[in-house]
Amino acid sequence: MSSLAPHEFSPETTWLNTASYGLPPARSLAAVQRLHAEWAAGRTAPMADETVVDRIRDGFARLIDGASADHIAIGSGVASLLAPVATALPTGAEVLLAENEFSSVSMPFVHRPELAVRVVPLERLADEVRPETALVAVSAVQSADGRVTDLARLRAATRAHGARLAVDITQAASWFPLRFTDADYWVCATFKWLIGARSVAFFAAAPEAADLIRPLGPGWFAAADRWAELYRPVALPATTRRFDSTPDFIGVYAALGGLDLIEEIGVEKIGAHNLALADTFRTGLVKLGYAPVQENSAIVAVPGAGEAAERLQQSGIIASARNGGLRFSFHLYNDETDVERALTAMGENRASV
């Protein structure tokens, strides 16, 4: 199985670390270099063409079936985009979180001591929703080990009890099918599976969900008519764009290149590719005597093997130590040779311990 875009990537290592950081495609690198050169020469400013923000907003909306650009706000990180959701909850409201949830999802709620935060195993999340639950916040795909949340089942549970659902799709967007009606609020960083930029993230909400929260400290970029309101703020837009923060335009150019490439290839094709590589790797690990987490995911985790990450890096295999385990992640630029190299390195690691 070959890379889905060999002309866009030329890593010098076996990069199996997309769950930490995606590799930028050549088109993104070229766009950023060109923008920097023009800026340094005084021919333009990074924000001279605001339509690039419209394009990236449209592109992200197309990743979620049923979403439109009016449902999308641009920001810089998951936690800050979740802050309005957390702040809108009344004192004593119950928030349900999964055990070992990534901290950018949990911290906006955990650090509001007036909320009643309850943490349960991921597999019991839907069963634990109850009438007093105000909100469930969860990642569609878990950062630590790649376990996949049953969003349809969880959505049914939240609807049955009148709870809201916030979903982080940072580890899912690009390879995992997403349906807008499966959550009230969506957040996503672009620098991992969207092969974008560290400084660009998205928030999505339908009007009825967005109307339950309000922007915290809106800036000039969130104005209904931003250039007309620079010195006399009048109104925020009726769309989810009112949650915009001023974007890093250089990051937007980088993220746009990644989104364009993902759309050209297609989520379905990327998902099939990633899952096939991950499944082959998972099967190989079992044959070597390891016990990886069994999940149909592009992330493969080996519990208790986190100490091997540094040894693998010395062999040019880039993975991550997370929550005591060793985490590998397979994306569109990986191929079967990467799987073979990683299995060889894991075999050598097995023999050395």
Residue ranges and their predicted role:
Residues 1-353:
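Pyridoxal 5′-phosphate
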